[in-house]
Amino acid sequence: MEGKEEDVRLGANKFSERQPIGTAAQSDKGYKEPPPAPLFEPGELTSWSFYRAGIAEFMATFLFLYITILTVMGVVKSNSKCSTVGIQGIAWAFGGMIFALVYCTAGISGGHINPAVTFGLFLARKLSLTRALFYMVMQCLGAICGAGVVKGYQKGLYESNGGGANVVAPGYTKGDGLGAEIVGTFILVYTVFSATDAKRNARDSHVPILAPLPIGFAVFLVHLATIPITGTGINPARSLGAAIIYNKKHAWDDHWIFWVGPFIGAALAAIYHQIVIRAIPFKSRP
């Protein structure tokens, strides 16, 4: 037992087979922050992995919109709450799809599936501006296509039931909607930072495998809280795809909220995690 305790205390770098589950493979003292991503990285444009990651973001956002908008349509068209999955079912559809899609794409693109997540990670210098812009474009295109497929074979149902577009609900002000989007996106992006934290991943080897679970659960909980207010955006691509395909005036009246709110929330989450939680600007540099 004394030998094992000594191995763990030293980081167990040389005795990985004796390391208890969940203990550090690398001590905090020996941990080094990964270098920030360059602002511009033109070399990415000649790499197949760059385009493969963009395609993964497109497909993930396409599938996300397809499943979630179908779920929303099924709930909205029902005359009885007892005959449908209700708000809880919608929240599970959004959270469950994020869980599945992050798990599928994390090793290829990072599993963003959301321009707000991409924006937050860019502010934290986790990826280059080149990649961030490419991801956002592919996410928006995927969302448009996903909503378009739903409308393509259920046009009447789609147009008569709001098309899954995000709007501020009657009884709430634009400020209420903006606040809900800021806080909801903050929760999501803060969870993403925590679940993918490089230092935590180095310390606990099981953390990267579990990362999709808290991210999906955060999406689920935010939807439970804010569906009655805005229909829950917290994802500008999701809001844009539904608005473009539905394309009715009221879908555009409050659309700015679903870009400004998530981007503010993502920026606040990035600042909070990097400066307050990780204190990266205050760490001494050699």
Swiss-Prot record:
Residue numbers covered by motif NPA 2: 235-237
One annotated GO molecular function: channel activity
SUPFAM superfamilies: Aquaporin-like (SSF81338)
Annotated membrane topology: Multi-pass membrane protein
Pfam families, per database record: MIP
Induction comment from the UniProt entry of this chain: Induced by salt (NaCl) and water deprivation. Repressed by chilling treatment. Seems to be regulated by several transcription factor genes, including MaERF14, MaDREB1G, MaMYB1R1, MaERF1/39, MabZIP53 and MaMYB22 under salt or cold stresses.
Gene Ontology BP, a term: positive regulation of response to salt stress
Gene3D superfamilies registered for this protein in UniProt: Glycerol uptake facilitator protein (1.20.1080.10)
Highest taxon above the source species: Eukaryota
Short motif NPA 1, span: 114-116
Membrane-spanning residues: 55-75, 89-109, 132-152, 175-195, 209-229, 257-277
Entry's localization field: Cell membrane
UniProt topological domain (Extracellular) ranges: 76-88, 153-174, 230-256
CDD domains recorded: MIP
A cellular component term, taken from the record's GO annotations: plasma membrane
Disulphide connectivity of cysteines: none
Record topology, Cytoplasmic segments: 1-54, 110-131, 196-208, 278-286
Biotech / industrial applications: Can be used to improve resistance to abiotic stresses such as cold, drought and salt.
Alphabetic keyword roster: Abscisic acid signaling pathway, Cell membrane, Membrane, Stress response, Transmembrane, Transmembrane helix, Transport
Expression sites (tissue/organ): Expressed in leaves, roots, stems, flowers and fruits, with highest levels in roots.
Spans annotated as Disordered: 1-34
Family: Belongs to the MIP/aquaporin (TC 1.A.8) family. PIP (TC 1.A.8.11) subfamily.
Its job: Water channel required to facilitate the transport of water across cell membrane; mercury-insensitive. Promotes primary root elongation and root hair formation. Contributes to the tolerance to multiple abiotic stresses including salt (NaCl), cold and water deprivation, by modulating cytosolic K(+)/Na(+) ratio, maintaining osmotic balance, and reducing membrane injury (e.g. oxidative injury). Also regulates the expression of abscisic acid (ABA)-responsive genes during dehydration and salt stresses.
Domain notes for this protein: Aquaporins contain two tandem repeats each containing three membrane-spanning domains and a pore-forming loop with the signature motif Asn-Pro-Ala (NPA).
Name of the protein in its database record: Aquaporin PIP1-1
Organism of derivation: Musa acuminata (Banana)
Lineage: Eukaryota, Viridiplantae, Streptophyta, Embryophyta, Tracheophyta
